């Protein structure tokens, strides 16, 4: 293991490029020389080995003569899954505990081990279940994994999934958020010893289990170890066999429509159960949460974005005020369709009018809107889906900032199975699906980001329909094959990602503007000559008359503009690391300054920004001050 590190360092010192292909050659050569299994020298073990030597054997590490610049290059070589922080932020997804859902959609899975619409085999869900759905434990596990893969974790976006957030009790909401912040504030990163596969160079899988008994006492942070024991003592299972058997009887009844998901969840997780006992201490006050938030303003791992998901009918001024106090900056909202007939026959229990109101309220409160849009619903057609999505992207009442657009999946236990068996629903063919998605990409405007085109379901869980995880790549190939010169403008396609950007070539594009029923929106973006995007800002100029007429519902007044998002791309760099990433060249500050000029010229007296907890200090340095739910600046 050490020799591979030394070989990489020597190559870098000679000015050579060590890409993945070159690294594989180095690993294979060293495996042959040592007569070792190349899997024991895999890339995923190199960085933890380097980190352990630097931390625990400083004299040995000093002998490698690694200065700051050489270490930066080495980490670029060893970093696993570099795209995870390519957007400039390290993302941690956490899942709330199973809970009754206010909806009952026809296509929705009914996995009793999960909150509604999620499956226990999804990666984030499996991690959550192994961590008892505890927010502190989930963050600790992901923070550890990101650190061991070499990712910077100064700037964290927390994504809280689990169905309709507002369905949970307010005390649980405050506790869940408080524990997310607490884990980051505590720097709850486990040592290398906590992962026996990474603890020692050359370890085999057979030896990994035995190392657990030899791990140092501080392998897990004390809070993590103590909390795991608390759940174990309460009778909360983490063993797969126990988890499966614990819900088996209820799951069978739900799958054959004898009793519903909500009734079963109450029996499994309500009073008189181990989860009922745990629920007694899963509550916090807003004061406790705000204490953790204040600490996080200057913590090692700062929250620069916080996302919850909800339904349009749950979006009210009161709900938005609460989630803003919790620290949220973005809302994921299940829309699925704008066709009222499709909404009705798929039993969404919402109206298009409710969707319109939810978008207007969310915008006026300053939230980023991340919508879910589903193709191939019961009753849908490919041409109808194309028209519906185009309306969603071009009609002012909607026009989300970000979207997950994915095909409906047939999951065992959902009520859609009966429709399939009766011949009332069929999945689109691959050709139909690619055709719809290719058209959807083309009509997606420059201010919108398509974050996903497929749910993270295991192919084993999908009964029929698309099971290919590389659906986006197939869609992009379809677009290229069309040869019609269609331009893709959506954000994700244009992100500079892990590549750098020549800052001298960047220009500030202010041409993207659009009207909604309640705001005039401006999308400012730093772009390369090729149209790649290095950063952007979302500026809302609210309709003064509307704000004045709804003053009792809104937290702002009519002469206040709103910055809803500032994002600068490039590999996430650690605080104080003056590397070449676009984030370190004042692009964000220049965007904010220009937004202030535009708002002032439009006649607004003040400008608000929906700051995350961990970006408050940044905006204070730019002249903003704390003001209610936002930070504000006089214009």
Residue ranges: model-predicted function:
Residues 120-138, 158-182, 196-370, 374-431, ...:
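Conserved non-cysteine loop/helix-boundary elements of the Radical SAM core domain that shape
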């Amino acid at each position: 293991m050490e020799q591979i590190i030394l070989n990489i360092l020597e190559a870098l010192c000679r000015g050579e490029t060590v890409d993945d292909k070159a690294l594989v050659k180095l690993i294979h050569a060293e495996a042959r020389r040592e007569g070792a299994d190349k899997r024991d020298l895999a890339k995923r073990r190199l960085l933890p080995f380097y980190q352990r030597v630097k931390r625990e054997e400083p004299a040995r590490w000093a002998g490698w003569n690694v200065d700051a610049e050489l270490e930066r290059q080495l980490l670029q070589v060893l970093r696993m899954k570099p795209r995870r922080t390519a957007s400039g932020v390290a993302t941690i997804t956490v899942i709330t505990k199973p809970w009754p859902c206010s909806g009952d959609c026809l296509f929705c899975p009914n996995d009793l081990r999960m909150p509604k619409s999620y499956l226990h085999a999804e990666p984030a869900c499996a991690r959550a279940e192994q961590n008892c759905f505890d927010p502190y434990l989930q963050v600790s596990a992901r923070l550890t994994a990101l650190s061991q893969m070499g990712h910077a974790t100064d700037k964290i976006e927390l994504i809280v999934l689990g169905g309709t957030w507002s369905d949970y009790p307010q005390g649980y909401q405050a506790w869940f958020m408080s524990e997310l912040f607490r884990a980051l504030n505590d720097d709850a990163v486990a040592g290398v010893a906590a992962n026996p596969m990474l603890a020692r160079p050359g370890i085999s899988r057979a030896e990994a289990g035995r190392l657990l008994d030899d791990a140092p006492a501080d392998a897990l942070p004390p809070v993590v170890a103590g909390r795991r024991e608390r759940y174990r003592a309460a009778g909360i299972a983490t063993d797969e066999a126990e988890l499966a058997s614990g819900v088996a009887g209820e799951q069978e009844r739900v799958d054959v429509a004898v009793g519903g998901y909500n009734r079963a969840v109450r029996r499994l997780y309500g009073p008189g159960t181990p989860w009922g006992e745990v629920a007694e201490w899963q509550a916090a006050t807003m004061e406790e949460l705000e204490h953790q938030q204040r600490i996080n303003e200057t913590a090692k791992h700062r929250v620069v974005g916080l996302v919850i998901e909800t339904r349009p009918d749950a979006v009210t001024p009161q709900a938005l005020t609460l989630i803003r106090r919790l620290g949220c900056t973005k809302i994921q909202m299940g829309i699925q369709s704008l066709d009222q007939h499709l909404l009705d026959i798929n039993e969404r229990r919402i109206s298009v009018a409710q969707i319109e109101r939810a978008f207007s309220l969310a915008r006026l409160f300053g939230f980023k809107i991340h919508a879910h849009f589903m193709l191939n619903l019961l009753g849908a057609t490919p041409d109808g889906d194309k028209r519906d999505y185009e309306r969603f992207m071009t009609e002012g009442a909607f026009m989300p900032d970000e979207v997950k657009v994915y095909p409906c999946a047939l999951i065992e236990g959902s009520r859609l199975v009966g429709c399939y068996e009766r011949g009332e629903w069929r999945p689109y063919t691959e050709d139909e699906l690619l055709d719809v998605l290719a058209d959807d990409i083309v009509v997606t405007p420059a201010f919108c980001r398509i974050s996903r085109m497929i749910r993270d379901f295991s192919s084993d869980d999908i009964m029929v329909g698309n099971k290919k995880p590389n659906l986006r790549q197939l869609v992009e190939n379809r677009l290229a094959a069309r040869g019609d010169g269609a331009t893709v403008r959506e954000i994700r396609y244009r992100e500079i990602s892990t590549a750098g950007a020549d800052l001298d070539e960047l220009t500030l594009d202010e041409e993207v503007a659009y009207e909604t029923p309640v705001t005039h929106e401006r999308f400012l973006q730093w772009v390369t000559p090729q149209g790649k995007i290095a950063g952007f800002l979302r500026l809302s100029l609210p309709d003064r008359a509307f704000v004045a007429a709804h003053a009792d519902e809104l937290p702002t007044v009519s002469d206040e503009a709103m910055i809803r998002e500032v994002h600068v791309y490039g590999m996430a760099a650690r605080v104080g690391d003056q590397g070449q990433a676009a984030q370190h060249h004042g692009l964000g500050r220049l965007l904010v300054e220009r937004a202030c000029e535009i708002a002032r010229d439009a006649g607004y007296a003040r400008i608000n920004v929906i700051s995350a907890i961990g970006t408050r200090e940044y905006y204070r340095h730019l002249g903003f001050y704390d003001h209610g739910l936002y930070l504000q600046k006089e214009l």
